[in-house]
Regions:
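Non-cytosolic membrane-interface motifs at loop->transmembrane helix junctions
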Residues: 451-460
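Membrane-embedded alpha-helical segments of integral membrane proteins
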Residues: 36-80, 387-390, 394, 482-533
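Aromatic-capped interface at the extracytoplasmic side
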Residues: 62-63, 104-119, 552-565
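Divalent metal-coordination and catalytic microenvironments
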Residues: 51, 128, 180, 260, ...
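Hydrophobic alpha-helical segments
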Residues: 2-58, 357-358, 473-484, 488-491, ...
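Non-globular, low-confidence helical/coil segments that flank catalytic cores
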Residues: 165-168, 172-175, 179, 198-205, ...
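Hydrophobic alpha-helical transmembrane segments in multi-pass membrane proteins
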Residues: 65, 73-74, 80-95, 209, ...
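Membrane-interface helix/helix-cap signal primarily in integral membrane proteins
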Residues: 1-38, 85-88, 99-283, 654-663, ...
Length: 704
């Protein structure tokens, strides 16, 4: 029976004994849970994801034996859940078992990918085998394995190098030698920011950098094995397709066409990307369910229609199964050439389930198929749980499935014309997906778009009817050298989408830059949203409580008054106007841009340099904030005077003994901490690496 929240709460409480009000609540929760026992299975992916998240949230790296212990606990809990308990106890034991499994597989992935990580910057000559190419606006980024270097007795398994000269001569599988500036993979720009070092670690990359001059061809350290030859063939095919697309289309259209076909986004103009993102069209660039549905489902209906036109085949053979098989093979090829991102893999895993449902005349999308896709992804690649693409993709699809269930019931009651349903479907899909991904977009990218529905209403017909069909035709025509015409059509449609994106993103109030908030707020909102989406009875609306708590945590978040990058020379200080300012032009411009974005400030860093209350000279800068004197020393000559008069000393040089300051940070301490965020009231300094914890991807050795 469906009832409102308050009547339900009063009924639960009244059923408890006097003085034991929680008993009524617990009994009410138990009854609601038993009524929805058929949906308990939907919480197993949540338990698995929670276990993997616990691993990544650990403050120190668990020792290897913990993985074995967790697997043993998993087996024990599974065995216990099969005993003669009541169904609710068995479900709880199964959930705990899956949670421990998630922790174990995450640790096992770390053990599988663990390798040497560069601890300090250096210039060295190195050689290696090219395993991946990514063309960008600044040049060619290559991934090298079989790395050898005289200065590195234990080199990283893979390094990522930017090459600007002679890049046209490099191909996948080739051995190259070059002189490069190598650096450790970058960490977060501030506590709580995206951890790029962790992403590099789980991609097997132990160093990044750029080359001096052109790369030279060198012999390989060892011949490639069968798997290396296969992956090399795939990457070489992707690279050749990328070059052929860009040779046929102008820069902007070619870069976006490449992103849609091969998944390579490095060459997209930042202004074009910003226009699409602020118009609510960022999903066009990230291969996911939209692309896979247009390829897989579109090809299914096309092949089925073609076969149905032949009476002998239509009457005597299972043409729907044939069409489904062709669709799955095509989608598999698409995911291979597109790089197999988390969102694309999720969509591909769901495609056979969707087609099977269509063959059985059942709803194509369901929470169970989505949950199975999540389980497969998390078991194969647990680090996906930390990636924005994974989180946003599943949030959007889960919300769309929940709304689709409601829509199917409503559509039977209120029939409408095909055109009305089509327009309403695009608008509702855009609205639901935008709302579901809003917390993640605000947390990771600091932006909230307001005209996503309009952008999608204008651009999606072009995407579905022209862009994706012409992309499929161009790929099919490439082996015959006939891709020019379909690529030109694709370029025309992309130009149209860019024009629409610029129009929508240029409307007043199209986007709001939002300040950063703590991870706990995002977790609370996510758990509340899952409670609402995965249950069906009225108790689902109790999920609004953690959602409201998460919003409150986000609104109450304290912003840092001072930020220091790991180079100790890039510093931002909150001014009297409440905004961040840079005493001097920042050396680490990426960090500077991230700080402003996370502060909810849409300014370019160039517009934030200097402030009236800052006093600077050749030795450093002095500021007075909240009654505290802050000295930012850029040369060692000023340290003695700064230590005598300042409450906070930040030095780009090694620190001398300082007695007076309440807080003193020198270059080595700042580098070892990976940067700092400081609040003045109360005075507190948090290092980036302290928040990251003692993990294999965290570099704690001081930079010399």
């Amino acid at each position: 029976m469906r009832t409102g929240l308050l009547p339900q709460l009063r009924r639960w409480v009244s059923q408890g004994r006097p003085g034991l009000l929680p008993l009524g609540l617990l009994n009410g929760l138990r009854r609601s849970a038993l009524e929805e026992r058929h949906r308990w299975v939907l919480w197993l992916p949540v338990a698995l994801g929670t276990g993997t998240a616990f691993y990544f949230a650990a403050p120190v790296e668990p020792p290897p034996w913990v993985a074995g212990a967790a697997l043993g606990l998993f087996v024990g809990l599974v065995a216990a859940s099969l005993q003669g308990w009541n169904s609710l106890v068995r479900a709880c034991l199964a959930g705990m078992a899956v949670l421990t499994l998630g922790f174990a597989v995450a640790k096992l992935q770390e053990m599988r990918v663990a390798g040497p990580v560069l601890t300090r910057p250096m210039i060295t000559h190195l050689s290696g085998r090219v395993t991946g190419l990514d063309w960008g606006s600044k040049g060619l980024r290559v991934i090298l394995d079989q790395v050898r270097s005289g200065r590195l007795p234990d080199p990283p398994a893979r390094v990522r190098i930017l090459i600007q000269k002679g890049a046209d001569q490099i191909s996948v599988g080739q051995g190259v030698g070059l002189t490069a500036q190598l650096m450790p993979p970058p960490g977060p720009s501030a506590p709580g920011d995206n951890d790029f070092g962790r992403a590099a670690f789980f991609a097997g990359i132990g160093a990044t950098g750029f080359s001096f001059g052109a790369a030279q061809s060198t012999p390989l350290a060892r011949p490639p094995g069968s798997w290396d030859r296969l992956t090399g063939f795939v990457e070489d095919m992707r690279a050749r397709m990328t070059l052929r697309i860009r040779a046929q289309l102008p820069k902007s259209e070619g870069a976006i066409a490449t992103a849609i076909i091969t998944g390579e986004r490095g060459g997209i103009d930042p202004d074009d990307e910003a226009a699409l993102r602020d118009a609510g069209l960022a999903h066009v660039l990230a291969i996911a369910g939209l692309h896979m549905a247009l390829v897989g489902a579109g090809l299914f209906w096309l092949v089925r229609a073609a076969l149905a036109a032949i009476p002998a085949l239509a009457l005597g053979y299972p043409i729907k199964k044939w069409a489904a098989s062709v669709s799955i093979v095509a989608a598999a090829f698409y995911i291979v050439i597109s790089g197999a991102s988390s969102s694309a893999t999720r969509a591909f895993v769901m495609l056979p389930m969707m087609l099977s449902a269509i063959l059985l005349d059942r709803p194509a999308l369901s929470m169970r198929s989505l949950g199975l896709a999540a389980v497969i992804l998390l078991l194969v690649r647990p680090v996906s749980i930390t990636e924005p693409g994974f989180q946003m993709s599943f949030a959007a699809v889960a919300s769309l499935v929940a709304v689709a269930e409601w829509e199917q019931r409503r559509a039977r009651l209120i029939p409408h014309s095909w055109l009305y349903r089509h327009i309403r479907g695009i608008a509702l899909t855009s609205l639901v997906a935008s709302f579901a991904t809003l917390p993640f977009a605000m947390y990771y990218f600091g932006r909230a778009t307001h005209y996503a529905v309009l952008g999608n209403l204008l651009a999606m017909p072009l995407m579905g009817l022209v862009t994706m069909p012409s992309a499929a035709l161009s790929v099919a025509a490439m082996p015959f050298g006939l891709e020019h015409a379909p690529l030109q059509l694709m370029g025309w449609s992309i130009d149209g989408m860019l024009r629409l994106g610029r129009f929508v993103s240029g409307l007043p109030g199209a986007v709001t830059v939002t300040p950063a908030f703590p991870l706990s707020a995002l977790v609370s909102i996510t758990l509340g949203g899952l409670w609402i989406l995965l249950w069906r009875l009225s108790w689902r609306w109790w999920g609004l409580v953690p959602v409201a708590a998460g919003i409150a945590l986000a609104l109450m978040a304290q912003r840092p008054d001072m930020l220091i990058a790991s180079d100790a020379r890039t510093i931002a200080l909150r001014g009297e106007d409440g905004r961040l300012h840079f005493p001097r032009p920042p050396k680490d411009r990426f960090a500077a841009a991230r700080w402003l974005l996370r502060d909810g400030d849409g300014r370019d860093w160039r517009d934030a340099v200097g402030e009236a209350s800052l006093s600077c000279d050749g030795l450093g800068c002095i500021a007075d904030r909240n009654g505290l004197v802050i000295a930012m020393s850029s040369r060692p000559e000023s340290l003695e005077a700064d230590c005598d008069r300042a409450d906070i000393v930040v030095s780009a040089a090694p620190l001398i003994p300082c007695a007076k300051p309440r807080l003193a940070l020198g270059a080595r301490q700042i580098a070892d901490g990976g940067g700092y965020a400081i609040t003045l009231s109360p005075l507190r300094a948090i290092s980036v690496n302290r928040q990251r914890g003692e993990r294999p991807w965290v570099i704690t050795e001081p930079v010399q």
